[in-house]
Amino acid sequence: MNTETTSVRKFRSANIHIYGKCNYRCEHCFDRCLTKNYMRPSDWVDTLTFLKEYGVEKINLAGGEPTLYPFLDQMCYLVKGMGFKLSIVSNGSLITEDWMARMEGVVDWIGLSIDSIDEADEIQIGRGRGGHLENIVQVADMAHRHGIKVKLNITVVRRSWMKDFRPFIEKVRPERVKCFRALTLKNANDDVPDTWSITDKQFEDFRRRHEDIGCIVFEDNEDMVSSYVMFDPMGRWMVDSGYEKRFISFEVLRREGLDREVDVEKYFGRNAVYEW
């Protein structure tokens, strides 16, 4: 695959938020503003073709909760059939052994999301009603049995920044760990009281205590904004420059290019390209 050393730097991955609904109610979620409408897999062909011709290599299917999308299997087959590496970002609650078996050789990565290593925190945050952490370990085990790599996504929030995630990470055995600092975006999650934000010092303390884990990366708020190529469930280009979520038509993207809103240097700066 192409790496950061490529002479002309281009975005190598893109996130398609295929479905806006979710069965969890995480307090800090900045995707709850997504439209509840959605497109069929065939409607995504133009977007995927554009991304393929541009040089994108990996597609991340996200939500909402992508396993609620009624055409998930067909979408996975489409993306894989077009030659992309395929990742799915999920809360893991609806993933079964049967689905994993069907996706063996189709899905390359599964990203599993947590905010704390304390189940009481997860319940307070809105990530299910109990048993979330145990289920994440079980789903990770399923993935490994079927040859699917695991990425553990940790959102570092006010309830969890001081805790030690090492024992839980060892249980999950992920090939990659990504730690996000909880982010507030205008028009996304600024409509409710902020109970999740942490200070620079708190995030740095969390980083210092975990940075020697070999497969781990950290994304502060400034690393995140304007560094992701994203699409909403209706195929609109989703951008967050200036800490404000906005939606731009695909036609504008095709005419003006990804560089209009997304910073390729920030993309590479957050270690977005790795061995996938």
UniProtKB/Swiss-Prot annotation:
EC primary class: lyase
GO molecular-function term, one example from the UniProt record: metal ion binding
UniProt domain Radical SAM core: residue ranges: 6-216
Taxonomic lineage from the root: Archaea, Methanobacteriati, Thermoplasmatota, Thermoplasmata
Similarity annotation: Belongs to the radical SAM superfamily. Viperin family.
Signal peptide: none
Cofactor: [4Fe-4S] cluster
Functional summary from the UniProt entry: Expression of pVip50 in E.coli (strain MG1655) confers resistance to phage P1; has no effect against T7. Catalyzes the conversion of cytosine triphosphate (CTP) to 3'-deoxy-3',4'-didehydro-CTP (ddhCTP), probably via a SAM-dependent radical mechanism. The modified nucleotide represses transcription from T7 RNA polymerase-directed genes (possibly by acting as chain terminators), strongly suggesting these nucleotides block viral polymerase transcription. How this protein allows bacteria to resist viruses that do not encode their own RNA polymerase (such as lambda, P1) is unknown.
Domain of life: Archaea
Species annotation: Thermoplasmatales archaeon (strain ISO4-H5)
Residue positions binding [4Fe-4S] cluster: C22, C26, C29
InterPro entries: Aldolase_TIM, Elp3/MiaA/NifB-like_rSAM, RSAD2/Viperin_antiviral, rSAM
Biological processes per GO annotation: defense response to virus
NCBIfam families reported for this sequence: viperin_w_prok
Annotated catalysed reactions: CTP + AH2 + S-adenosyl-L-methionine = 3'-deoxy-3',4'-didehydro-CTP + 5'-deoxyadenosine + L-methionine + A + H2O + H(+)
Keyword line: 4Fe-4S, Antiviral defense, Iron, Iron-sulfur, Lyase, Metal-binding, S-adenosyl-L-methionine
Pfam name, any one: Radical_SAM
PANTHER family in alphabetical order: RADICAL S-ADENOSYL METHIONINE DOMAIN-CONTAINING PROTEIN 2, S-ADENOSYLMETHIONINE-DEPENDENT NUCLEOTIDE DEHYDRATASE RSAD2
PROSITE patterns registered for this protein in UniProt: RADICAL_SAM
EC number(s) given by UniProt: 4.2.-.-
Protein name per its UniProtKB record: S-adenosylmethionine-dependent nucleotide dehydratase
